[in-house]
Design a protein with these regions (language model features):
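Extended, non-catalytic subsegments within catalytic or DNA/protein-binding/adaptor domains
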Residues: 1-350
């Protein structure tokens, strides 16, 4: 609040403005800001340089060099910390933030090119999308795992939902296993079942996302997942998972939990994927994570000739495209999903 008063905001209004500014920042941004502040202190201690805000050009370049040399982070991560650094300046009242201009941009571009060259030399590739073939392999290998039925159904329910709904991993899963944020975590009260409209009697799983990226500042969005006549049906997978729970799940608890009742996290899901797909994916050369599911359906749709607009709508990559899509009648959307499922499974061109 102090920096706002220094800018000339009346003291009686400063608290209101500060509170509004805080609500305008996502929790992940606050986390990045906190991490950046800690790194500034560590960098200052390691280099013996007084890294005080506001940063000079030399401070910014020192910070970038320290992150690369000492923290061994990639260019993409450095850019994230730079965003946190800008936030640190804003929080201290420096609203006209200029962290180096063209020279810093040139250095960051060079680090990005260096990372790409190193990845190429090491045979590493970009993140793989989860394609239909990978989903088939995941299902087959899950059946062979010496896991409890509940654990298998948990992994498969997450996988089918992530694939069918192009969800971001933490739209479905907890960040940590022992606690959760009810304002962003998918809870039991956020999912419900209904029956299709018109002549369709197929089930619809309604998933309410409280804080999706494509609806910032709005009251969330509902993603409809439709029952399909295939092994990829997310509705059936969810029903089986819920039946396998060994405890009573309250409405205010996370949807996806382990048999011990702990939150199933994105890290845990990634770990399970590596185990189940160990004979399918060359993990030394390929990068497949929980986020790969988000690109999976889009990849299949592109291969079938769907337009960019359709893909952006179904995958929620563009807020205007998706919000236009969800305003269409549910019967029409169900037909779209049925058509997509049929073509994806049969591999026929549109």
């Amino acid at each position: 609040m102090g920096p706002l008063i220094e800018l000339g905001v009346p003291e009686v209004l400063a608290a209101t403005v500060a509170r509004a500014a805080n609500f305008g920042i996502a929790a992940s941004t606050w986390k990045t800001y906190s991490t950046a502040v800690r790194h500034i202190s560590a960098c200052s201690e390691d280099t013996g340089r007084n890294m005080s805000i506001p940063f000079s050009l030399a401070d910014t370049l020192t910070f970038i060099g320290w992150l690369k040399l000492k923290r061994k982070v990639r260019s993409k991560t450095i850019k994230v910390y730079m965003a946190g650094l800008r936030m640190a300046h804003l929080c201290q009242g420096f609203n006209k933030v200029e962290l180096g201009g063209d020279l810093v941009s040139h250095v960051l571009t060079g680090l990005e090119q260096e990372d790409r060259l190193r990845d190429k030399q090491m045979g590493k590739r970009d993140r793989m999308p989860v394609t239909l073939n990978i989903m088939k392999s995941l299902r087959i290998n899950l059946r062979k795992m010496q896991w409890t039925l509940g654990r298998k159904r948990l992994v498969w329910a997450v996988a089918t939902m992530a694939f069918a709904g192009s969800f971001r991993v933490h739209e479905l899963l907890s960040h940590v296993k022992n606690r959760f944020d009810p304002t962003s975590t998918l809870l039991m009260q956020d999912i419900s079942n209904s029956v299709g409209e018109g002549d369709s009697k197929k089930k619809v799983l309604k998933v309410f996302l409280k804080s999706p990226k494509e609806a910032k500042g709005k009251e969330g969005v509902v993603v409809d997942l439709f029952e399909t006549d295939s092994y990829l049906c997310p509705v059936l997978a969810m029903e089986k998972y819920l039946r396998s729970l060994t405890f009573t799940a309250s409405k205010a608890s996370p949807v996806f939990r382990t048999s011990q009742g702990q939150g199933y996290t994105g890290v845990a899901f990634n770990s399970d994927l590596k185990v189940v797909l160990r004979n399918v994916i060359d993990w030394d050369k390929s990068k497949l994570t929980s986020h790969s599911f988000r690109a999976g359906l889009a990849t299949e749709l592109a291969g079938l000739g769907y337009s960019d607009q359709d893909i952006m709508a179904l995958g929620r990559w563009r807020s205007d495209a998706y919000l236009h899509y969800v305003k269409t009648a549910r019967t029409k959307r169900m037909k779209v999903v049925e058509e997509v499922t049929r073509k994806v499974l049969r591999g026929r061109k549109k």
